[in-house]
A protein has these predicted regions:
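Hydrophobic transmembrane alpha-helices and their immediate loop junctions
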Residues: 1-243
């Protein structure tokens, strides 16, 4: 029970550390490109209350991917339209990647030099053990959530950041862009629902094979762990291996 509470608290903190800077980065990039909309509406801030979205928060907590309240942006205010659209779209995920890069070694340090080196002492002092676990779970969850949000948001489906990238790189008359703009949100909802159903079947019915039918979950976990996350843990594992 205590382990569950620790994990839950760590997850809540991790979600805030991932989603709030993500939205702030969008607002900051838009502001730097000439659009003051986010600043004038009070969204150029790290105050989590300003960015809170209940549905996105709950989805992130239960499925591992979600969103905060979208930052209001008016691309017509950008000094250079396509550049502004592109940099604003990718600002959030780049911020998440940087945060994940920073948090992974913090988690490693806590695990190796606090938990592993003092495991016998911690086992005799449960309160300190739970504290050490919490201090480890927080940066590790931030690392994992950050990569998940990175991969999830780069899906080229309206209204995700990936679709904004498509908008920045294609003509308004591009057929693929028009299709994604019109049906992207429906595809996204379908993927989320399908992923949730598969997760519930796997968890409560014990059907592990269903994970291979979880399209969104399989995509996010595979890309986040084996592609996007590989440079981070590969680099830091190499650095720590030198000592």
């Amino acid at each position: 029970m205590i382990d569950y509470i620790i994990t839950l608290l760590a997850s809540v903190i991790a979600i805030l550390f991932v989603l709030v800077p993500h939205e702030y980065a969008h607002a900051f990039a838009a502001y730097k490109n000439g659009d003051w909309t986010a600043k004038l509406t009070g969204r150029l801030t790290l105050n989590p209350v300003k960015h809170f979205d209940l549905v996105g928060f709950l989805l992130c907590a239960f499925t591992g991917f979600g969103w905060a309240k979208p930052v209001p942006i008016n691309p017509n205010n950008f000094r250079k339209y396509k550049k502004g659209l592109f940099t604003t779209a990718v600002a959030g995920v780049i911020t998440n990647y940087i945060i994940s890069f920073i948090c992974y070694p913090i988690a490693l340090i806590i695990f190796r030099y606090v938990i592993q080196m003092n495991i016998e002492y911690l086992m005799d002092h449960k309160a300190l053990l739970y504290l050490a676990k919490f201090l480890y779970y927080v940066p590790m969850q931030i690392y994992a959530f950050g990569l998940t949000i990175f991969v999830f948001n780069l899906l080229p489906l309206n209204p995700l950041d990936g679709f904004r990238v498509v908008e920045a790189l294609t003509s308004p008359f591009n057929r693929v862009r028009i299709f994604l703009q019109r049906y992207g949100s429906y595809i996204l909802i379908g993927l989320i629902v399908e992923s949730y159903i598969c997760s519930m079947i796997q968890q409560f019915a014990g059907v592990d094979a269903i994970q291979y039918f979880n399209i969104l979950g399989f995509y996010v976990q595979t890309v986040a762990k084996n592609i996007i996350g590989y440079p981070i843990h590969g680099f830091w594992d190499w650095i720590f291996g030198l000592f």
